[in-house]
Amino acid sequence: GGSCGQCRVEVHSGGGDILPTEEGHINKREAKSGCRLACQVAVKQDMEIEVEDEIFGVQQWECEVISNDNKATFIKELKLQIPNGESVPFKAGGYIQIEAPAHHVKYSDFEIDEQYRGDWKHFGFFDVESKVDTDTLRAYSMANYPEEEGIIMLNVRIATPPPGRLHLPAGKMSSYIFSLKAGDKVTISGPFGEFFAKETDNEMVFIGGGAGMAPMRSHIFDQLKRLHSKRKMSFWYGARSKREMFYEDDYNGLAADNDNFQWHVALSDPQPEDNWDGLTGFIHNVLFEEYLKDHEAPEDCEY
């Protein structure tokens, strides 16, 4: 607990002093005003707390797995079907929490596309097992946008043990998610979030890499497909090699249909078979060198 910093509450009385696990998320001024992380506050006495109104709109759903497909070597796209007649009233950039029961999964049972199995074998990951004795809760950003109704779509990267140290624990939730198959039942709750677009005419610059694609896709699709925004916007995405890129056709289509949108990919480790003649390096450096360095007013952009 205490790693994501999303469960902020205002504690007006009780709760004790702020813990070291909270100090990375809460500064001294906020702590003085009573800001705490709910997951770190032990209830040992009567307390007075204040939570945001939107928390009371949180619901729980039992969903069914539609598909759980590889999009990159270590990234899956999990699609969940919301129960008939119900909806998750989320905003682009929002997230849900997903529950994993106690489980024992073997990586050798994962459904991994043939084109990616070589890397899994090379690192010995098919020998990994994940054994979890308690329920687990984790937050994931939606990759779909509000008009893609009836589903929740997530981009999930597997948290494997480091190569050569396979005795270390694997990611509890990502291992569970990678084990899911069509028809399985999954419990989620939400919606949550604060990473929402501001309603201005300012230029938008989206930056992401790997499974960080999820909120970027949600935002960009929402701006261009639902809101039909005319704001200038660009998406800068970083991947290791060409095989780690995904949703290219979607973004190429958006760029072709919207003069105000461009997207750029930089590969940090292009392979010989990629025949890559595009941008290379880490995406934050590429963004600065290729665009922001000569931008007339980068401080006016929304990132």
Swiss-Prot record:
Kindly give the SUPFAM superfamilies that the UniProt entry links to this protein: 2Fe-2S ferredoxin-like (SSF54292), Ferredoxin reductase-like, C-terminal NADP-linked domain (SSF52343), Riboflavin synthase domain-like (SSF63380)
Q: Where is the FAD-binding FR-type domain?
A: 58-198
Its principal location? membrane
Output one GO BP term. Answer: sodium ion transport
Free-text cofactor note: Binds 1 [2Fe-2S] cluster.
Record's CDD domains?
Answer: fer2 (cd00207), NADH_quinone_reductase (cd06188)
Species annotation: Colwellia maris
Q: What catalytic activity is recorded?
A: a ubiquinone + n Na(+)(in) + NADH + H(+) = a ubiquinol + n Na(+)(out) + NAD(+)
Report the function annotation for this chain: NQR complex catalyzes the reduction of ubiquinone-1 to ubiquinol by two successive reactions, coupled with the transport of Na(+) ions from the cytoplasm to the periplasm. The first step is catalyzed by NqrF, which accepts electrons from NADH and reduces ubiquinone-1 to ubisemiquinone by a one-electron transfer pathway.
Q: Which family does it belong to?
A: Belongs to the NqrF family.
- Listed binding positions for [2Fe-2S] cluster are C4, C7, C39
Gene name of the record: nqrF
Matching PROSITE patterns = FAD_FR
* Gene Ontology MF annotations: 2 iron, 2 sulfur cluster binding; metal ion binding; oxidoreductase activity, acting on NAD(P)H, quinone or similar compound as acceptor
Is Oxidoreductase set as a keyword in this record? no
Sorted alphabetically, which InterPro entries does this protein's record hold? 2Fe-2S_ferredoxin-like_sf (IPR036010), 2Fe-2S_ferredoxin-type (IPR001041), Beta-grasp_dom_sf (IPR012675), Cbr1-like_FAD-bd_dom (IPR008333), FAD-bd_FR_type (IPR017927), FNR_nucleotide-bd (IPR039261), NqrF (IPR010205), OxRdtase_FAD/NAD-bd (IPR001433)
Give the main EC class: translocase
Q: Any idea where the 2Fe-2S ferredoxin-type domain is? A: 1-45
Record keywords = 2Fe-2S, Cell inner membrane, Cell membrane, FAD, Flavoprotein, Ion transport, Iron, Iron-sulfur, Membrane, Metal-binding, NAD, Sodium, Sodium transport, Translocase, Transport, Ubiquinone
Q: Name one GO cellular component term.
A: plasma membrane
Q: Which cofactor does it need?
A: [2Fe-2S] cluster; FAD
Q: What is this protein called?
A: Na(+)-translocating NADH-quinone reductase subunit F
Which E.C. number(s) belong to this protein? 7.2.1.1
Q: Where is this region: Catalytic?
A: 201-303
One Pfam family matching this protein: FAD_binding_6
Assembly mode: Composed of six subunits; NqrA, NqrB, NqrC, NqrD, NqrE and NqrF.
Disulphide connectivity of cysteines? none
